[in-house]
């Protein structure tokens, strides 16, 4: 499934809850957390309390060295029962293909991101296409919790994303 929303809508809080519930329901279940960049994977580990988050490249064995271990690892299905990938909007078609081809039957996948932020550098807008295809369950978080109720930052960001140039001004 997909969880999407603007900054401050609670994506990280939802992830923490998913992990907590999953651990209670499936105490022996294998969980893998990944993100496209080292910074995003570290932030994911810190915010969820799950210290095994890693980059997609590392998790898929797509290291810079072309050694036998990486080649073998690239062909094996991921052993996880639950795979959560944060910042999926940054994933291009090549990396998405590598990722999806490694999912074992029965694994649960949660893709998280904001399609209006950090698009992939490579070809393809995979996250947006998955959201729009109507084949994958999508949860859109649209209430902003990070800013105060009087803040106009979130409103203006939404207006800009919609192409609206009439912005509101206030104390922040």
Across the structure, where does each feature detected by a protein language model lie?
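Inter-Walker segment of RecA-like/P-loop motor cores
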Residues: 31-81
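Walker B catalytic acidic pair
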Residues: 87, 113
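Post-Walker A helix-loop "phosphate-sensing" segment adjacent to the P-loop in P-loop NTPases
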Residues: 21-30
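The conserved Walker
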Residues: 7, 88
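Conserved helicase motor core of P-loop NTPases
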Residues: 115-172
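Hydrophobic anchor at the beta1->P-loop junction of P-loop NTPases
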Residues: 3
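Hydrophobic positions on the alpha1 helix immediately C-terminal to the Walker A/P-loop
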Residues: 14, 18
């Amino acid at each position: 499934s997909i969880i999407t929303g603007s900054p401050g809508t609670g994506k990280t809080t939802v992830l923490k809850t998913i992990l907590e519930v999953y651990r209670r329901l499936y105490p022996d279940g294998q969980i893998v957390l990944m993100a496209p960049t080292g910074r995003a994977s570290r932030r994911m580990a810190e915010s969820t309390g799950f210290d095994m988050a890693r980059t997609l490249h590392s998790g898929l064995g797509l290291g810079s060295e072309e050694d036998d271990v990486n080649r073998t690892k690239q062909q094996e299905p991921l052993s996880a029962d639950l795979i959560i990938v944060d910042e999926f909007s940054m994933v291009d078609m090549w990396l998405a293909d590598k990722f999806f081809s490694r999912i074992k039957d029965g694994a649960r996948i949660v893709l998280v991101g904001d399609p209006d932020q950090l698009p992939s550098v490579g070809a393809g807008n995979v996250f947006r296409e998955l959201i729009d295809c109507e084949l994958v369950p999508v949860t859109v978080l649209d209430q902003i919790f990070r800013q105060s109720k009087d803040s106009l930052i979130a409103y203006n960001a939404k207006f800009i994303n919609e192409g609206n140039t009439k912005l509101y001004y206030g104390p922040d």
